[in-house]
């Protein structure tokens, strides 16, 4: 049973990580524009970016279109590792809980706690990569540094900037995946009831996976958005050192109270929701694509893993006397 548990967890983790990698790459230019737009905080009328599209046009007008992909390698690495850890932890904890209660059906509360625990493990282990990718994205176009240089610019403690908010934001994917999983189970149960028991297993269509992913992510994003923006500002690249000679300005304290005070003072209550539309667009598309791709390749991944296990078991039997 233990072997089956590990194999199924690895299958879930692998398919989830591949889905995350592909969705991250497809939507990366939008993510870069969104991050730079969120990171800027200035008094109304003095903003460099009034609209999200201003970031995109700046890249084009300055001849740095490829800079929309600055930090893509680090982001993909962080995305793949974090998704693998998350889906492995989520699947592993979920199956352990099922074994403990003797049922495969898990309630919403238990599912939420399991997802939050998986998210917390992921945040702690991948925070330096998350910080580095945010700094690269929010750097001036054409001036992004490499991964090692970005991480070693400050102390190693700076590599964990925003960890507190990251742990708080575990409620975001926890809500999303819980809602998605519950809706998915309901749809599959209805599909099984309509189909013949001897027929092939019912699977979620790509379109329905996309819709469920979008619905489950929207509510979580709206609720947690103020924390999301604060996190981006804490992790953003500090270009003020290079720009001090041109236009001196007081730096924002890279702490939760510091960024909250800065947003409140310069932008007011609505500042906590600056870039919300872009965040919803990006996160909904990203999550929906991730889950859609994951659902479509999970079966293939599981078959490959079973084939590999069968190969090793067969070799072991041939070697044994």
Curated annotation (Swiss-Prot):
Expressed in stamens, pollen grains, seeds, leaves, cotyledons, roots, stems, flowers, hypocotyls and siliques. The chain crosses the membrane at residues 10-30, 106-126, 160-180, 203-223, 256-276, 288-308. Keywords: Antiport, Membrane, Peroxisome, Repeat, Transmembrane, Transmembrane helix, Transport. It is a multi-pass membrane protein. It comes from the Eukaryota. Solcar repeats lie at residues 7-96, 106-186, 204-300. SUPFAM superfamilies: Mitochondrial carrier (SSF103506). Its main location: membrane. InterPro entries: Mitochondrial_sb/sol_carrier, Mt_carrier_dom_sf, Peroxisomal_Ade_carrier. It is found in: Peroxisome membrane. One of its GO terms (molecular function) is antiporter activity. GO terms for cellular component: peroxisomal membrane; peroxisome. GO terms for biological process: ADP transport; ATP transport; fatty acid beta-oxidation; indolebutyric acid metabolic process. Peroxisomal adenine nucleotide transporter catalyzing the counterexchange of ATP with AMP. ATP is needed by reactions that generate acyl-CoA for peroxisomal fatty acid beta-oxidation during postgerminative growth. Required for the beta-oxidation reactions involved in auxin biosynthesis and for the conversion of seed-reserved triacylglycerols into sucrose that is necessary for growth before the onset of photosynthesis. Belongs to the mitochondrial carrier (TC 2.A.29) family. This is Peroxisomal adenine nucleotide carrier 2. It comes from Arabidopsis thaliana (Mouse-ear cress).
